[in-house]
Amino acid sequence: MPAVKRKAAPTLGAKLQRRVRPRFEAEPDSDVEGSSDEAPSEEEGGGFHTGSDTEEEEEDEEIEEGSEPGSDDDSDAPSEHGGAGIDASQLSFGALARAQASLGALKKKKKKKGGDEDGSDDDEEKEEPNWKTEIEKGMKAKVEKHHRTNKHAPVETTSKKPVSRRRDFLANEPAKPKSRDPRFAPPGIGGSSGKSVVDEIKARKAYSFLDDYQEDEMKQLRMAIKKTKDANEKEELQRALLSMESKKKARARKDKERELLSEHKKKEKELIKQGKTPFYLKKSEQKKQLLVEQFASMKKSQVDKAIERKRKKIAGKEKKALPLARRTAEDR
């Protein structure tokens, strides 16, 4: 038979060093009876207590002793309602710790509620006067700042412009056409191109007497230029006279063009009656015939001056069209 080893019996010193849990008799009227009974039952289910459990109980006892005096008053509160006082020395350390933790949590909740109420009142008082500034800040933040990528680049602006909600085209009546003086209005307003030419010819014939008035004004200007001694005033009068003379020449040139076209149309109408095909003058042909008639009515010296003036004008245009001359060794 194999030898069976037995455990050695614990010595007296080991027995004395072992920590023993204090026992107490729970009162039936106490409210904490359930919690005190549950604590040993749970601990007894474990079989035995380790050293860590005893250390935790000692820490709870130290916390209880170092707690504020208000906690003792709170712990005695149930005794006042229950009628019978509870001896704290008879309660377990775990039950006292749980009771103390529950009371501390209640105090914290009350403090938080009071702080939140005070804070909300202060926030409302602070926010009331500053709501305008907050709105203005929000509006400024929405405004987009347009920047240029380069100082020479154009500013980039958004195309997302809001359309106005007002629609005035239904409320406002259309403007009625105003009466115009044909002397100052352009010919053929609201008509076709052919109609405008006819209206211009009619207006020119109807208001041909204005040419006589303009001739008188030009004579008065020439007299005023001779009499005035102020250089600035004399220059202004000369400009006015020059503009009137240029307008007179332009009107005379247009009148000649119309006469030339009207004569050509009359001849073509007679030829069409004879059964011939019509021939329409080009603008280049019209200019040639106008130049021939213009030189025919001028003297030889005037013709030479006009030809020289025209030659210089054409030479100047050709010179501008030429590229710039390059520098050569002789120019250096």
UniProtKB/Swiss-Prot annotation:
Enumerate the subcellular locations listed in this protein's record, separating them with semicolons.
Answer: Nucleus, Nucleolus
Q: Where is this region: Disordered?
A: 1-91, 104-196, 243-262, 312-332
Query: InterPro entries given for it?
Result: RRP36 (IPR009292)
Composition skew (Acidic residues), residue ranges: 27-45, 53-77, 117-127
Basic and acidic residues composition bias: residue spans: 128-142, 165-183, 315-332
The record's function comment reads:
Component of the 90S pre-ribosome involved in the maturation of rRNAs. Required for early cleavages of the pre-RNAs in the 40S ribosomal subunit maturation pathway.
How does it associate, per the subunit comment?
Associates with 90S and pre-40S pre-ribosomal particles.
The protein's name is: rRNA biogenesis protein rrp-36
Which gene is transcribed and translated to give this protein?
A: rrp-36
